[in-house]
């Protein structure tokens, strides 16, 4: 018999990680109610540093040359591209060789997250086929059981009762048939009206041709869905004429068509440089005429997602729902630039066509789900709480040798709810699922700070490496009304980061910083003047000084974000050691940062609030919660 969800108690469970050599396995990462005691002398040094910074000097946010023990290593080989999927290794810009850093085991162990989902060891990428079944949330994921690099892709499987605490299960599917022998790649789940679960996934054949295959649970009454059967008639779809054999992958969840009993699904592809979404009718797997949508110049579309959102209320919708008060979201992961783009529009099921509300914001040329390290996202409808939930892959941006040393690579984002932004009419709102708040430890620390131009203040928290912060910022109205003097054409990625000062920015928080601010990751707002002369807000995450190690990504992520009349500038950050997920204005703009500090680790991480503007006084209001660790461990199958 399968264990019922109610018999799993996270309060009495233990997390098991795979620790590096020389590091004792201490079991569950300790609760973060009180991580360490700061000595009086340390407090004195911190206050002294803060005083020096505040003494008529702007924050120490300038870029400096790193000093580190460096070695040259061979260039990282390409992985995945030759088989027809996106590049799976982070490519340093240094050419034929790259600079690597000598990481200690303590540093690498610190990088492992405490409440984001990741396997015990080895490589992980795309989230696959998320669903809810008989009391359990199921997450499948691309996994290499042999190594911390991409290859031998298998479907990992885990279950949860709350999307936060997870139990690893045996592999759902392995590459063991001619039609998937080179990889059981990304797929989606469709739940039929009678409760039958159909999983459609891409297989890489023995001839490296991308085909679509069906699988289904061997025992639908099993809440854990432990055993899966591959359909004997696989493959059910092969690349159609005019489509490359390596340009046909990642089927979506199916939805009901206009004809009785008809089911439709879409698959990403390209024709030349035009990204397209093909549509198939599933009763006989017939390719329908035309395409659901196409956008020239966007290249190969991977991991396409297509679903409805309500313009009237805050509930999520089943993928097949259509009617009044409905918009549809088309999302594609762009192989050319490794970005997840989306567009909101109207779906005509009779003509099988999607039309964007604003062609200037079309898929691939407009809005992104996340402006940081975030790719291959996948949503599902959660019938338990009537919401649409979004998963995304957070990949590595360090060296492959470092991943091999630590023995794992990549995590999944915290699941997010997705809603239509009724105020703008153009954006989605993404927000961490409410269950993450169950990890909050006690009452929040509440702080209100009046920040003069060029000031920074240390915030004393129990842990500056594992927390949830909500912050709002109010710019003095007199200065804000002088927007005519602000700069025009600001761009996060080309701005110079938090060290670049203007009349109205930057201002925000500094996370995962050491006490001297030699390593820091600022997340901030910057107000500029738009082409129409009105104030335009930007939301940015600056990684340029996030690490003194060479060979890791150091750039500024971000985009503009609508801040409407009467709204304060608001942000929420989930900080989990080497991951920072940042949400602006209720989730209109989101940035995921993957960082690799060398100093701000093992209790040395600090949290600051700052205002590096030259002319604006900013009032910051903050609530900060320390977060407990999630329980992520193997399912006790011996109890079945």
UniProtKB/Swiss-Prot annotation:
Its main location: membrane. Keywords: Disulfide bond, Glycoprotein, Glycosidase, Hydrolase, Membrane, Signal-anchor, Transmembrane, Transmembrane helix, Vacuole. It holds the Pfam family Glyco_hydro_32C. The chain crosses the membrane at residues 34-54. The active site is at residue 126. Pathway: Glycan biosynthesis; sucrose metabolism. Substrate binds at residues 123-126, 142, 150, 185-186, 249-250, 302, 335. It is a single-pass type II membrane protein. Residues 1-33 are cytoplasmic. It comes from the Eukaryota. Residues 62-86 have a biased composition (Polar residues). Belongs to the glycosyl hydrolase 32 family. May be present in two forms, a 70 kDa monomer and a heterodimer of the 30 kDa and 38 kDa subunits. The ratio of the levels of the two forms within cells appears to be regulated developmentally. This is Acid beta-fructofuranosidase AIV-18. It comes from Capsicum annuum. The lineage of its organism: Eukaryota, Viridiplantae, Streptophyta, Embryophyta, Tracheophyta.
């Amino acid at each position: 018999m399968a264990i019922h969800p109610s018999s799993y108690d996270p309060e009495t469970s233990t997390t098991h990680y795979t620790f590096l050599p020389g590091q004792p396995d201490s079991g569950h990462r300790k609760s973060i109610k009180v991580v360490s005691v700061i000595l009086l002398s340390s407090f004195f040094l911190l206050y002294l540093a803060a005083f020096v910074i505040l003494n008529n000097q702007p924050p120490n946010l300038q870029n400096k040359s790193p000093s580190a023990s460096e070695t040259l290593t061979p260039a990282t080989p390409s992985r995945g591209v030759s088989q027809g999927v996106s590049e799976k290794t982070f490519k340093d810009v240094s050419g034929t060789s790259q600079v690597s850093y000598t990481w200690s085991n303590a540093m690498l162990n610190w990088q492992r997250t405490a409440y984001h989902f990741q396997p015990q060891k080895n490589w992980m990428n795309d989230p696959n086929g998320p669903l809810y079944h008989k009391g359990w949330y199921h997450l499948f994921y691309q996994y290499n059981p042999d190594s911390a690099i991409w290859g031998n892709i298998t479907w990992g499987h885990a279950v949860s009762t709350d999307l936060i605490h997870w139990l690893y299960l045996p592999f759902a599917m392995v590459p063991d048939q001619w039609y998937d022998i080179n990889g059981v790649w990304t797929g989606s789940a469709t739940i039929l009206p009678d409760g039958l679960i159909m999983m459609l996934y891409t297989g890489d054949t023995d001839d490296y041709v991308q085909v679509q295959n069906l699988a289904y649970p061997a025992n639908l009454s099993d809440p854990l869905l432990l055993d899966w059967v591959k359909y004997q008639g696989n493959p059910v779809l092969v690349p159609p004429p005019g489509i490359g054999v390596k340009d046909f992958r990642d089927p979506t969840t199916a939805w009901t068509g206009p004809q009785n009993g008809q089911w439709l699904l879409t698959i990403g592809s390209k024709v030349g440089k035009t990204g397209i979404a093909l549509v198939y009718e599933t009763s006989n797997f017939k390719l329908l005429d035309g395409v659901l949508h196409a956008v020239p110049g966007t290249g190969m579309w991977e991991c396409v997602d297509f679903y409805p959102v309500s313009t009237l209320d805050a509930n999520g919708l089943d993928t097949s729902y259509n009617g009044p008060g409905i918009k549809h979201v088309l999302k594609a992961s762009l192989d050319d630039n490794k970005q997840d783009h989306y567009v909101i529009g109207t779906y005509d099921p009779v003509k099988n066509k999607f039309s964007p509300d604003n062609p200037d914001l079309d898929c691939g040329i407009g809005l992104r789900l996340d402006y940081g390290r975030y790719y291959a996202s996948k949503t599902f409808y959660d019938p338990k709480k009537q919401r649409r939930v979004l998963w995304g892959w957070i990949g590595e941006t360090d060296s492959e040798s470092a991943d091999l040393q630590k023995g794992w690579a990549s995590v999944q984002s915290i699941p997010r709810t997705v809603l239509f932004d009724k105020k703008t009419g153009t954006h989605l709102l993404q927000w961490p699922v409410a269950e993450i708040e169950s990890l909050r430890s006690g009452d929040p620390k509440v702080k209100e700070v009046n920040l003069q131009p060029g000031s920074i203040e240390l915030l004393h928290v129990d842990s500056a490496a594992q927390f949830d912060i909500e912050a709002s910022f109010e710019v003095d109205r007199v200065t804000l009304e002088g927007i005519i003097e602000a700069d025009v054409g600001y761009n996060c990625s080309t701005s110079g980061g938090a060290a670049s000062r203007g009349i109205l920015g930057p201002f925000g928080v500094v996370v995962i910083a050491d006490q001297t601010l030699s390593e820091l990751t600022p997340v901030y707002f910057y107000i500029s003047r738009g082409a129409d002369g009105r104030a335009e807000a930007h939301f940015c995450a600056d990684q340029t000084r996030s690490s003194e190690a060479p060979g890791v990504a150091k750039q500024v992520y971000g985009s503009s974000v609508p801040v409407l009349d009467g709204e304060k500038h608001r942000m929420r950050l989930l900080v989990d050691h080497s991951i920072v997920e940042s949400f602006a204005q209720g989730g209109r703009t989101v940035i995921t940062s993957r960082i690799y500090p060398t100093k701000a680790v093992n209790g040395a991480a600090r949290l600051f609030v700052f205002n590096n503007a030259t002319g604006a006084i900013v009032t910051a209001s903050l609530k900060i919660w320390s977060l407990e660790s999630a329980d992520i461990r193997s399912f006790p199958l011996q109890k079945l």
